[in-house]
Amino acid sequence: VANGAVPCSKVTGKWLFPRAALDRWIEAGMAKPHGFVAHDAPPIVGGSHDPLLEWALRRSGSGLALLSVGSEAGLAKLAANEVAIAAIHMHALDNDDANLTAVAAAQHLHDAVVIAFARREEGLLVAPGNPLALSSLTDATKAKARFAARQSGAGAQLLLAKLMAADSSSIERLNLLPSTFMTGDDLAFAIRADEADCGIATRAAANAHGLDFVSLAWEHFDLAMRRRTYFEPGVQALLALMRSPEFHRHAELLGGFDTGAAGTVRLTR
């Protein structure tokens, strides 16, 4: 009102707000509280790649595309309204639920909800037979194993940093390959091609590529979205599948998933 942005007039000391003009002003998106987004995000799930999620998006007929850019980038795109959903598995030292912490702290996400997708088993992918006899990250460091790393901000890379810090070590002590890999599948291909000795990804990725697996941790893999997105038909189709026996059977087939809490609300803002 003070700067003239709101359509109104002052008559005999009283402010008058013309209904039609005010409605047009609101519809134009000029009245937005901090973090409010006036337009719908594109039907994209951005963030971490996951084979169970990829299958579920197709099988449910959700109409949602998958953009694999890593957990941190996915959450940033959600906040910027560039994706409808962020698929995330965050990690931080001394924080066993970094997903919820990250969403709660995110700017421009005052209306967020976090839905459990699955718990996943993460660990070291190694060549068949585990030729270097690796059983830990310490072994990988000592053996100077060629370590395939993920891009900065990827959940697997955050987990690697957390595990190394918990062991009073750092990623820099590993024999890292010069290039990084965008997905667990890319990392697995590098190991199959003998371009790398090991790297962190899911048990499902190891199973899919015929690799051996050294378990290191279980993690929450969640879907973050705005509350209004939750009620979209495509999202409801996905959630319906996540609650079905077929979803749980497919998770068992892939391996390394716990889908007992799939579809439950873990956080609302």
Question: Positions of the model-derived regions?
Answer:
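Short helices/loops that flank or line small-molecule/ion binding pockets
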Residues: 72-86, 91, 180-195
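A ligand-binding cleft/hinge motif common to bilobed small-molecule-binding domains
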Residues: 90-104, 188-217
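N-terminal hydrophobic or amphipathic helices and topogenic motifs
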Residues: 1-76, 82, 106-111, 137, ...
